[in-house]
Amino acid sequence: MLMWPQPHLPTHPHLPTHPHLPTHPHLPTHPHLPTHPMMSKETRQSKLAEAKEQLTDHHPQTNPSVGTAASDTKKKKINNGTNPETTTSGGCHSPEDEQKASHQHQEALRRELEAQVHTIRILTCQKTELQMALYYSQHAVKQLEGEARDLISRLHDSWKFAGELEQALSAVATQKKKADRYIEELTKERDALSLELYRNTITDEELKEKNAELQEKLQLVESEKSEIQLNVKELKRKLERAKLLLPQQQLQAEADHLGKELQSVSAKLQAQVEENELWNRLNQQQEEKMWRQEEKIQEWEEKIQEQEEKIREQEEKIREQEEKMRRQEEMMWEKEEKMRRQEEMMWEKEEKMRRQEEMMWEKEEKIRELEEKMHEQEKIREQEEKRQEEEKIREQEKRQEQEAKMWRQEEKIREQEEKIREQEKKMWRQEEKIHEQEKIREEEKRQEQEEMWRQEEKIREQEEIWRQKEKMHEQEEKIRKQEEKVWRQEEKIREQEEKIREQEEKMWRQEEKIREQEEMWREEEKMHEQEKIWEEEKRQEQEDKMWRQEEKIREQEEKVWRQEEKIREQEEKRQEQEEKMWKQEEKIREQEEKIREQEEKIREQEEKIREQEEMTQEQEEKMGEQEEKMCEQEEKMQEQEETMWRQEEKIREQEKKIREQEEKIREQEEMMQEQEEKMWEQEEKMCEQEEKMQEQEEKMRRQEEKMWEQEVRLRQQEEKMQEH
């Protein structure tokens, strides 16, 4: 007779049942077959426990977390068989609880997978954003480098333009000095011309006075000549009368007296003729002097015209220089506006870079937070694994006492877990080696980059030294050129001083000539006085010879008539000379007016030159201010370059960090892909297990039906035995 266990036996206190395991929805109970109150629970629980043990034996190494969870569920499912409601002799949970536990485990795994996939997507999005930010930052850095190069080239061009402006200013200054010297020469020549004009005016006045005196003398001579002619006629008449009236003695006496008078008259006429000849010579000399003065005046007029042309050319050159300076100022203003716009663009780009840096910092903080969360999740997983291992150890100790089969299965599981751990350790060691190799490579790359940076810095220092040397050479060449210009200017000054000395010597020579002429005039006056004395003596002698020269009177009268004609001609010539003198005076006045106009023009030019000097001084001040601005801009550019270098270093550090993060993310993605593959394999296995469980349940139902049939038969047999 079979003995069935009693339903009122207590369960084991150390083996609690799992309260959270739900029933499987795909395994409905059979509604038509009635279950035995004592046999159905035992058979079902024992068969389900054996099927789950077989499943854990088949797939224990797919996922360690799944395996631990399955072992935990197994440990929790094991029972002493003391619970009358759930167990009969095997001590297993109900299939509904196991199905609930498996569903909860699958849902938890799916949630973890979804969370990990979500984190992976977030990390990939952040990685793409970081890559885009890096690309834009690199593009901005390249643009800034190109703009910095453009600014440096423009600075060099501005420096060259400033040098050209300095050269132009120096040329203008030299031209101004030349113009000043030329103006000084013109003033000196003007003074010399004014002196000559003053002297010419004085000589003209003297000549006019002398001409007036000569005209008065000529009038006196003509009057005397007419009186002498009248006297001669009267004397002739008297002689004729005397010849008729007086005797011979009286006639001889009167003839002697008349001869003396004729001799005196002839002497006077000869003296007058000689004086006229002297005055004619003096007039000829004066005419020659006037012609020479006219030639000199023409030469001076030509020189003045040439000077006026030169002054016009200088004015045109000055106007061209002013136009060039205006154009250069406009170019400088345009360049300053461009520099201001570029500075504004640089400020805007710096603000954009700062914003990008802030975005990068925020993204880095987010990535750090994600990494911290990942580390926390890893720590939680490790803690859960440790707890699961501890629970496994405790449950394994309890199960060793209960079932030998479970020990064998657990030993197999442990061996498999040890293999997995060894594989994981090997993988970790390989990963550590790979990380160490990558770190070594990164350190080598960093060292190479540092060496490259050092070499680039050395090359830049050498380039700066070369540039400084070139600037020194250029400055030395400029100094040499300036010294050569100074030497040339000194030579020109010396030449001008020599010219001035020569002009002074010429002036001294002219003054000496004038003095000699004055001495000649004085000697001539003395000669005139001596001639007068001689004339008086001659007159006395001529009075004695008058009687002898009666015959010569007629000849002298003829000569006198000729001399009168000559005197008339001389008077006509004098009139012509006076007209010429008037014309020369008019020309001199016109020249004086022209000289005054030239002086006014020279004054205007001097005023213009002063204005140009003021403009050049203002331009020099502006150039100094511009040079100060350029120095400030260079300092700003250097500061910007330093900030750019710092930003580049920061960007490189960020790139390194991002690369490390990308490597970590790739590793995590690989791990996640492996986990996903494992999860897909686990899901496939779970689906296969569910199919097997359904098949086993169908088998169990068939077995239960057979058991029910056997029970019915046994009951019939028992009834028969009781009846017997």
Curated annotation (Swiss-Prot):
Start-end of Polar residues biased regions: 61-71, 79-91
Biased amino acid composition, Basic residues: 15-29
Entry keywords, A to Z: Coiled coil
Compositionally biased spans, kind Basic and acidic residues: 39-60, 94-108
InterPro entries: GOLGA6L
Positions of the UniProt region annotated as Disordered: 1-108, 314-342, 374-454, 517-548, 561-724
Classification via PANTHER family: GOLGIN SUBFAMILY A MEMBER 6-LIKE PROTEIN 1-RELATED, TRICHOHYALIN-RELATED
Similarity comment: Belongs to the GOLGA6 family.
Name the record gives this protein: Golgin subfamily A member 6-like protein 6
Gene responsible for this protein: GOLGA6L6
